[in-house]
């Protein structure tokens, strides 16, 4: 039932840590998900330095999905969007042929507080890799279906699962779900998609007689229902879908074509990618 278990790799960004879950050397993608980061958890004091912010930077060939448990982030991008994301909301940014954006912790810098959340990259199918860039923000149960019963709280972040559909405009069959489980509660993930995984964002769960702990991802074999039992209060992120084929990933670029990534690198280095309208005073240079 469990094909593989691995730990998120912690990276210190100076003001807080990020756990890099995907890509993993032995399993680079789950369905169309090419990248998964756990941001925090971390506590910020008012007035922390702006160096913690993510300055403007580019993407191609993917959609980014930001989802928070705690805190807030201010998003600005090159299609003119300005959005403050708060817990249990979704920022969905489709890069397509190319977009730039920044993510800044302006509210936390002013008031202090905690940051804890997830960021995923979802590879676009080949026929959609060069679509026009776009951005949408989603919140509330009308857009992100919510279910609560007997110690389980479930929110469908994106895609389709458990008979529900999120309003996030995805481009291939996928699912992304946030579970909160009280101790002793069991919940099942059906065999609906060929590629499925679970990331334990907090707590401990048991699956198929094996204990999974905080900051671990388990990748599941296809064709079987997966039953989770919470050993303590736990936060579990479920994700997967239909594969879209292999992808090249370099810096912030994802593509089915290595040449396309080289072109994007050249465009960014030469200043040919438009910076966000509302945040164009600085940017992250291409790594050498």
Curated annotation (Swiss-Prot):
Identification of the protein by name: Pirin-like protein CC_3178
Family, similarity comment: Belongs to the pirin family.
Residues in coiled coil: none
Pfam families in the record: Pirin, Pirin_C
Gene3D superfamilies in UniProt: Jelly Rolls
Classification via CDD domains: cupin_pirin_C, cupin_pirin_N
